[in-house]
């Protein structure tokens, strides 16, 4: 069974952050990740990764596909960010250029880059 990938919730600008008790259920904050917004669909058999604009990203991140298929216990949809961090542990930085190199027509290059600079998914 394939899940339809829904449209993601997008961040929006505000003039100021409201007080936490001014919003029903409170507030949650996270940093701005320098990556690709992605929706992941796992139906128990196949993994599909789509951009926030519904463009297919699955073929560009084989290491994520393999990890999702191995680690996700049940069918689900995940909303998150694909990033690549480079540098020594403790001083890593997200690398936009390394990430954008993954969108390449040659499968051999995508596979090589997935081994040299593996991506991470932050949900």
Predicted features, each with a name:
Residues 1-123:
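Catalytic cores of nucleic-acid ligases and guanylyltransferases
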């Amino acid at each position: 069974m394939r899940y339809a990938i829904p449209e993601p919730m997008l961040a929006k600008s505000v003039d100021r952050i409201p007080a936490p008790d001014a919003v029903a259920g409170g507030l949650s904050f996270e940093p701005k990740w320098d990556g690709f917004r992605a929706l992941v669909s796992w139906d128990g058999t196949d993994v599909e990764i789509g951009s926030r604009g519904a463009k297919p990203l699955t073929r560009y991140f084989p290491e994520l596909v393999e990890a999702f298929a191995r680690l996700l216990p049940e069918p689900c949809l995940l909303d998150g960010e694909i990033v690549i961090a480079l540098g020594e542990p403790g001083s890593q930085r997200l690398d936009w250029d390394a990430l954008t190199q993954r969108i390449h027509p040659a499968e051999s290059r995508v596979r090589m880059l997935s081994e040299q600079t593996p991506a991470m998914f932050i949900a």
